[in-house]
Amino acid sequence: MTNIRKSHPLLKIINNSLIDLPTPPNISSLWNFGSLLGACLTIQIITGLFLAMHYTADTTTAFSSVAHICRDVNYGWTIRYLHANGASMFFLCLFIHVGRGLYYGSFTLLETWNVGIILLFSVMATAFMGYVLPWGQMSFWGATVITNLLSAIPYVGTDLVEWIWGGFSVSKATLTRFFALHFILPFIISALVMIHLLFLHETGSNNPLGMPSNSDKIPFHPYYTTKDFLGLLLLTLLLMTMALFYPDLLGDPDNYTPANPLNTPPHIKPEWYFLFAYAILRSIPNKLGGVMALILSILILMVIPFLQPNKQQTMMFRPLSQFLFWILVADLLTLTWIGGQPVEEPFINIGQMASMLYFSLMVFIMPTTCLIENKMLKW
């Protein structure tokens, strides 16, 4: 008799995705981050749901409702800090996941890669709207500054901004719609995750060698379920340590001051995971140019499959590309640091150089190096 997990219509899908899935035998811990992102999304949806039960999306009571959650709701402070730091863990896993895709050439799986970039944009939009909800100073001014960037779009910009605001400034209408969108987007993200996995399972996973492993695959369970569980354990440990011992380590003190439209904070800056893009935005003196650079800093990932003419899929045996990859990582860390600094010398200069290096590496230096390495293969 056939096992029920192989014959039942619903269990069969789960079985083919999580149990009997043929997996390369040599994938490293860097392949754990996909499942960790799934865990992060689950944590965010559950904690977010409990927060939404007590939160009120109204400019007069939003800040107080967050204080009420932290003071009066049973373990409300834990849920709030798990949600806030869970977002940081989410982005940490996301950046490593994308970095692994770049290093090991996973961008050759075009459909999976492109859905992944759409997912990255969706998660960034969700996180931005979530940051506005506590209605502190940085929430209000962050929302004002970032939404106001759309006014740089020629002809329709101003109308578009007022349409998003629901008025002539960031107000109750803005907060209400941001809450509604922040609530619905994680479920849209969940659907996109299913599509991401559907495309991935069409082709199968890549591996560190970049070699076809069809003749040598092993079942996902028990090998990789055990391996993923260890990753989940470490992620939980890190998240709980952050939420319970250092809950405000990555937050902004300004957000403990209620939003005041008449008082601008000295340094408006987003959360740490947006700082690299914010630094690129600020490094261009023109408003429209800055907005375009900001969008292109992420959108450039979509053209990477067409910019990499490499004969070997992964960087495993390409030392020049490896060196450039780590320069790119250092450059992104520099941009993250610059994004949190005030707009003055020498930070302006460093930011401009780091932004130029970022785009040069992606568009010109790395593809040229690939061509050189292709030539070296013939020597």
Curated annotation (Swiss-Prot):
Quick one: where is this thing mainly located?
mitochondrion
UniProt superkingdom: Eukaryota
What keyword terms does UniProt attach to this protein? Electron transport, Heme, Iron, Membrane, Metal-binding, Mitochondrion, Mitochondrion inner membrane, Respiratory chain, Transmembrane, Transmembrane helix, Transport, Ubiquinone
- Location relative to the cell: Mitochondrion inner membrane
Q: Where does heme b b562 bind?
A: 83, 182
* UniProt cross-references to InterPro entries, sorted A to Z: Cyt_b/b6_C, Cyt_b/b6_C_sf, Cyt_b/b6_N, Cytb/b6-like_sf, Cytochrome_b, Cytochrome_b_C_euk/bac, Cytochrome_b_N_euk/bac, Di-haem_cyt_TM
Q: Which family does it belong to?
A: Belongs to the cytochrome b family.
Q: What is this protein called?
A: Cytochrome b
Q: Which organism is it from?
A: Lepilemur dorsalis (Grey-backed sportive lemur)
